[in-house]
A protein has these predicted regions:
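Mobile late-domain/C-terminal helix-loop "cap" segments
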Residues: 140-188
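A short structural micro-motif
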Residues: 30-31, 91, 149-153, 166-167, ...
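Residue-level recognition of alpha-helical structural elements
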Residues: 17-20, 49, 78-81, 139-140, ...
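Mg2+-dependent prenyl diphosphate-binding active-site environment of isoprenoid biosynthetic enzymes
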Residues: 1-141, 179, 205
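Short amphipathic alpha-helical boundary/capping segments
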Residues: 132, 189-190
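Short, charged, amphipathic alpha-helical segments
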Residues: 86, 175, 198-202
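Short, amphipathic C-terminal "tail helix"
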Residues: 180, 185-186, 193-212
Length: 212
C-alpha cells in the first residue's frame, strides 16, 4: 500500500513540473537517509541528542517542509516566502514528532487510545530517554539501568515508565519541544498579519501541546 501511495504521489507531482519533481525527490532522499540513521546507533563521539534531532529533521521535518514549500510555491508566493514556509514546515514536523514521543511516555491511555511505553519496549531512545540517560543524579541510577537494558518484560517496562514519568527528563524534553515550536512561529514574523498567519501560529500550538 505504501508503494502504491508513493507511486500515486509521484504521478500527481509529475503534473506540477520539473521543479516540483526535484523537490519531491530531494525530500524522499532525506526521508530515507533519516530512516537509515534511525536504524543505526549514534556514532561514537557524536552527541546522541543532536543525532536524534537530526534524524527527526530528515524523517519528519523534510516531509512537512515539502508540503509547506509546495503550498507557498503554487500559491504564488515570492521566493523568500517559499523558503520561509519550508523552514517553518520543517520545524513544525520536528515539533510534531517530539510531541508524539512524549505522548508515548506521559499520556493517559484512556484519553489517547495508545499503549504507553511502546517506544521503550522496542528500545527506541526518544528525547526524554536520551536526557534521562545523560543524567548523573545517583537517585536515578535505577532508571538509567532499566533504560540501558531489555524492557520487553512487562514488569521492567512498567517500572521504567513510572520512573521516567517522574523524572525531570520528561519536562526537559517538553521544553525542547516548545522551543522548536517557538522557532517555527518566529519564522512567520515577516509575514503580514492575516487569518492565514494566525492559523499557522495556532497550528504550532496545537501540535506542541497535544495530548493524543
Amino acid at each position: 500500500v505504501g508503494d502504491l501511495l508513493f507511486g500515486k504521489a509521484s504521478e500527481l507531482v509529475a503534473g506540477l513540473g520539473a521543479e516540483a519533481v526535484l523537490i519531491q525527490a530531494q525530500a524522499f532522499v532525506r526521508l530515507c537517509a533519516g530512516q537509515i540513521r534511525d536504524d543505526r546507533p549514534c556514532p561514537p563521539g557524536d552527541d546522541p541528542v543532536d543525532y536524534y534531532l537530526g534524524v527527526l529533521h530528515d524523517k519528519t521535518g523534510s516531509l512537512i517542509a515539502t508540503a509547506a514549500r509546495y503550498g507557498a510555491m503554487f500559491g504564488g508566493c515570492s521566493d523568500d516566502v517559499v523558503e520561509l514556509m519550508a523552514a517553518y514546515g520543517e520545524r513544525l514536523g520536528v515539533a510534531f514528532q517530539l510531541a508524539d514521543d512524549l505522548i508515548d511516555i506521559a499520556s493517559d491511555a484512556t484519553e489517547t487510545g495508545k499503549t504507553p511505553g511502546t517506544d521503550l519496549r522496542e528500545g527506541v531512545d526518544t528525547l526524554a530517554v536520551l536526557y534521562a540517560k545523560q543524567g548523573t543524579d545517583p537517585a536515578d541510577a535505577r532508571l538509567r539501568e532499566l533504560l540501558s537494558g531489555d524492557l520487553r518484560d512487562d514488569d521492567r517496562l512498567a517500572e521504567a515508565l513510572a520512573l521516567l514519568q517522574a523524572n525531570p527528563a520528561v519536562e526537559r524534553a517538553r521544553e525542547t519541544t516548545r522551543a522548536v515550536g517557538v522557532e517555527a512561529v518566529a519564522l512567520l514574523g515577516p509575514l503580514p498579519e492575516s487569518d492565514a498567519k494566525a492559523a499557522l501560529t495556532a497550528l504550532v500550538t496545537s501540535v506542541v501541546e497535544r495530548v493524543g
